[in-house]
């Protein structure tokens, strides 16, 4: 997904870079130290170029023994100074660059946590990972590494030009006639690098997304013998990425060749004009050698300044992608009403909602009441709007019209953090995080609870049997996404987490749909201990699990078309009765 805000889409490269530099402000003293080091490097290099005159005249022409003795020592001292200055520059710049990359990663992840749910529907996780990974690194390169090259090489060029002007301003000014051509080449190269860099970052995200999709679903890929088709898909995207990379290399090579050609033209002009000046007696052999050495030193510096455009423009392209996230509007959080512990009285009043880019509403005029201490089951065919309805309660999405009230007040009146503290969620796909069982139960704001509380909820969630059998018990590492545990075990840990939170509102999103009979029995038993004295909303796939619900809402195409108890709805012989009979292969009587 190409997500660029309108402001950033039209931001000039200089404006973007200037904004990038604001992130370096915190590390300005490191940059000052680095600049001093770069200046010392340039002075040492320029002094060496200036010494070419006495080396030539005094050593080879005048044969001055005294000068021949101290000049080698002076050159060693200059390069020692240059090496120390270079080390200081590299260390200071490197520390600043890595710090800025870290700051960007933290800022962008923090921002993602504040974005509305629609953002996560519209942008693949792979694209987010590219922003947090390579984009942040490219930005550090642009802010610091590119700056280091530009400062170092610019100072080297300036130093060499000062030496050249000192020995012959006429020759130097004549050579500077090629400067406009050089500036034109660098401007064209920068523009092309910037355009290609945008495409490369998007291509990297698509590559990561394709690999993540194939590897995450490796079992389906193998069972359906889809390896070849997935490889073809990945190879096609990799070829696009390769083509873009070749364009970058082509641009770099052509620009380097152009700079070298212009340098050769300048060198030829130097030979021509310097020869004329020497014949007129205005240029000594030492002057000529200093001019020639300085000109030769300028050419690689100019080449590096041209090549740094790739790093700089890639960083600017990455910065625009990062700023498109940082400039996105946060989810609405304007409530001011204090909320300690809610009673849990939920009321939907004429709620209509639709997803961005879709014309048909996902919910259409939905109204119902869920009282504290009751269980409200929500059933219906796939795509009827059950999960969309549930997602409105924690305000992952905002309705288009209507109101949702908690304890008589609109949800928007409460702070988001306070509202979400009232809700515990147990879904079908339980997400555990890489860490211990104890850390996954006492998750988030609950991480300071005592171990006795964790042990209590493990017992209540019917998880003690398998936890006690694990080598480290509660300290057992569950692996990435809880991969070292079974589905039923992960589900019981999710219930333990909800028990520990002790929130007045409980949302169960098909919590037993994917479990075997034994695991379902254990989970259902744990849920029976979790649900009392809470407002419980259950999305149910297996209708046999909601027979004792206080009310059942039957949804179809975003509307509630039936409501009542299990017995009442069976007696009506409507959609609920049909769905129930389909599960048990017979019409109820």
UniProtKB/Swiss-Prot annotation:
Describe, as the record does, how this protein assembles with itself and its partners.
Answer: Homodimer.
Q: Which PANTHER family match?
A: ATP-BINDING CASSETTE SUB-FAMILY B MEMBER 10, MITOCHONDRIAL, ATP-DEPENDENT PERMEASE MDL1, MITOCHONDRIAL
Where are its TM segments located? 29-49, 68-88, 157-177, 254-274, 283-303
InterPro entries this protein is in? AAA+_ATPase (IPR003593), ABC1_TM_dom (IPR011527), ABC1_TM_sf (IPR036640), ABC_transporter-like_ATP-bd (IPR003439), ABC_transporter-like_CS (IPR017871), ABC_transpr_lipidA (IPR011917), P-loop_NTPase (IPR027417), Type_1_exporter (IPR039421)
MF terms (GO), sorted A to Z? ABC-type oligopeptide transporter activity; ATP binding; ATP hydrolysis activity; ATPase-coupled lipid transmembrane transporter activity
Q: Identify the taxonomic lineage of the organism of origin.
A: Bacteria, Pseudomonadati, Pseudomonadota, Gammaproteobacteria, Lysobacterales
Which residues does the UniProt record annotate as the domain ABC transmembrane type-1?
Answer: 32-314
List S-S links within the chain: none
Q: Write down any Gene Ontology CC term.
A: plasma membrane
Identify its protein family: Belongs to the ABC transporter superfamily. Lipid exporter (TC 3.A.1.106) family.
The yes or no answer to whether the keyword ATP-binding is present is yes
**Subcellular localization, as worded in the UniProt entry:** Cell inner membrane
Name of this protein: ATP-dependent lipid A-core flippase
Coiled-coil residue spans? none
List the SUPFAM superfamilies hit by this protein, alphabetically: ABC transporter transmembrane region, P-loop containing nucleoside triphosphate hydrolases
> Which residues does the annotation say bind ATP?
380-387
What is catalyzed by this enzyme? ATP + H2O + lipid A-core oligosaccharideSide 1 = ADP + phosphate + lipid A-core oligosaccharideSide 2
Q: How does it sit in the membrane?
A: Multi-pass membrane protein
């Amino acid at each position: 997904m190409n997500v660029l805000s309108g402001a950033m889409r039209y931001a000039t490269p200089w404006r973007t870079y200037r904004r990038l530099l604001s992130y370096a402000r915190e590390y300005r003293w490191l940059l000052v130290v680095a600049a001093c080091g770069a200046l010392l490097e340039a002075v040492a290099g320029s002094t060496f170029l200036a010494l070419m005159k006495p080396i030539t005249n005094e050593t080879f022409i005048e044969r001055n023994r005294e000068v021949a003795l101290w000049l080698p020592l002076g050159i060693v001292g200059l390069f020692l100074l240059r090496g120390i200055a270079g080390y200081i520059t590299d260390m200071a710049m490197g520390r600043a660059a890595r710090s800025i990359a870290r700051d960007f990663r933290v800022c962008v992840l923090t921002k993602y946590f504040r974005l509305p749910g629609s953002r996560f529907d519209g942008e693949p996780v792979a694209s987010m990972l590219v922003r947090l990974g390579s984009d942040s690194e490219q930005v550090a390169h642009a802010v610091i590494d590119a700056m280091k090259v530009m400062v170092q090489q610019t100072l080297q060029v300036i130093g060499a030009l000062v030496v050249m002007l000192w020995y012959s301003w006429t020759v130097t000014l004549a050579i500077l006639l090629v400067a406009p051509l050089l500036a034109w080449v660098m401007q064209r190269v920068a523009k092309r690098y910037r355009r290609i860099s945008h495409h490369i970052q998007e291509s990297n995200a698509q590559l990561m997304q394709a690999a993540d999709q194939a590897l995450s679903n490796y079992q389906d890929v193998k069972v359906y013998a889809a390896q070849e088709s997935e490889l073809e898909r990945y190879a096609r995207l990799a070829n696009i990425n390769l083509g873009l990379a070749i364009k970058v290399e082509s641009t770099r090579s052509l620009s380097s060749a152009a700079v070298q050609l212009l340098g050769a033209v300048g060198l030829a002009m130097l030979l021509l004009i310097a020869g004329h000046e020497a014949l007129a007696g205005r240029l000594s052999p030492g002057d000529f050698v200093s001019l020639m050495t300085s000109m030769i030193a300028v050419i690689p510096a100019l080449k590096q300044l041209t090549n740094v455009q790739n790093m700089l423009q890639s960083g600017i392209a990455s910065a625009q992608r990062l700023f498109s996230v940082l400039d996105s509007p946060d989810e609405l959080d304007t409530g001011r009403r204090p909320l300690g512990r809610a009673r849990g009285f939920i009321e939907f009043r004429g709620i209509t909602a639709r997803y961005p880019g879709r014309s048909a509403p996902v919910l259409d005029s939905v109204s119902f009441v869920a009282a504290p201490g009751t269980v409200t089951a929500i059933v219906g065919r796939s795509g009827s709007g059950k999960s969309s309805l549930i997602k409105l309660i924690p305000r992952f999405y905002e309705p288009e019209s209507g109101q949702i009230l908690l304890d008589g007040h609109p949800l928007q009146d409460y702070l988001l953090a306070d509202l979400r503290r009232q809700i515990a969620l147990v879904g079908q796909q339980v997400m555990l995080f890489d860490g211990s069982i104890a850390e996954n139960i006492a998750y988030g704001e609950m991480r300071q609870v005592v171990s006795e509380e964790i042990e209590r909820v493990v017992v209540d969630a019917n998880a003690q049997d398998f936890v006690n059998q694990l080598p480290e018990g509660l300290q057992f590492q569950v692996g990435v996404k809880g991969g070292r545990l079974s589905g039923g075990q992960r589900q019981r840990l999710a219930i333990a987490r909800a028990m520990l939170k002790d929130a007045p509102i409980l949302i169960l999103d098909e919590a037993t749909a994917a479990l075997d009979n034994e695991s379902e029995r254990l989970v259902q038993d744990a849920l029976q201990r979790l649900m009392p004295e809470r407002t419980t909303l259950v999305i149910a796939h297996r209708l046999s699990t909601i027979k004792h619900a206080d009310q059942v809402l039957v949804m179809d195409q975003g509307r509630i078309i039936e409501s009542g108890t299990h017995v009442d709805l069976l007696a009506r012989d409507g959609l609920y009765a049909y769905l129930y009979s389909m599960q048990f292969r017979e019409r109820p009587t």
